A protein has these predicted regions:
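HotDog/MaoC-like acyl-thioester-processing domains
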Residues: 27-59, 148-149, 159-198
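Short structured motifs
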Residues: 77-83, 137-144, 170
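Catalytic strand-loop segment that frames the active site of acyl-thioester-processing enzymes
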Residues: 78-108
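A short mixed-secondary-structure module that forms the rim of ligand-binding clefts
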Residues: 96-127
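Hydrophobic beta-strand-centered segment that forms part of the acyl-chain substrate-binding groove
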Residues: 123-159
Length: 198
């Protein structure tokens, strides 16, 4: 409780009625303790998210993370994904345009982008679910809006906090090219259900 009132004091300092009793250094130290407590309290339970948070601080770490994902699900290796951002509610993954993912007209192949969409949706689902739940893709609706003539980035969002019982969950994904033009729009349907009791 005292920590909360100290935080309130930081927020209100300089405003009428603010409590200026504590020196600013004490308030900063108090705030850092609060931040640590908040982080601990809401620490991710997903092993995948913990691994990302540990490895994402460096280029090598992000490369190792992508390799690990490719090892767990080998088909994703075919697009050589580069993870940009990963957390509950958001996953952003980049695909570099190169010969191996091009079609006969020199643009990024439709199925490579579908693969990218499924990867982004699967990863955001994985890190957003509580440990008591599991998921598997059940379907995909995809629209190819423009030819992709450059690297592309997929963004999957899953704005959900409550999970209970078996359900189908649609995960929207957008893919943009290097100029920000949307080239693909997809919804990946995930079947989410409780893990069996062990």
């Amino acid at each position: 409780m005292q920590r909360c009132s100290a935080l309130k004091c930081v927020a209100l300092r300089g405003f009428p009625g603010a409590s200026p009793e504590l020196p600013i250094s004490d308030l900063i130290a108090e705030r850092q303790q609060l931040d640590w407590l908040t982080i601990t309290k809401t620490a991710p339970t997903s092993p995948v998210l913990r691994r990302w948070q540990k490895l994402s601080k460096s280029t090598l770490g992000r490369w190792l993370f992508a390799r690990g994902v490719g090892r767990a699900a080998p088909y994703f290796k075919t697009i050589t994904p580069r993870f940009v951002e990963l957390g509950p509610a958001l996953c952003r993954v980049r695909l570099r345009k190169r010969r191996a993912v091009e079609n006969h007209i020199g643009t990024v192949h439709a199925i490579a982008m579908a693969n990218l969409c499924e990867l982004a949706a699967g990863m955001v689902t994985e890190v957003s679910l509580p440990p008591s739940m599991r998921w598997i893709p059940r379907g995909m609706t995809i629209e190819y809006l423009q030819p992709a003539r450059s690297d592309v980035t997929a963004t999957a969002r899953l704005d959900r906090n409550e999970w209970s019982g078996a359900q189908n969950v649609g995960v929207p994904v957008t893919v943009v090219d290097s100029t920000g033009v949307e080239v693909v729009r997809a919804v990946i349907t995930m079947y989410v259900s409780p893990r069996p009791q062990q």
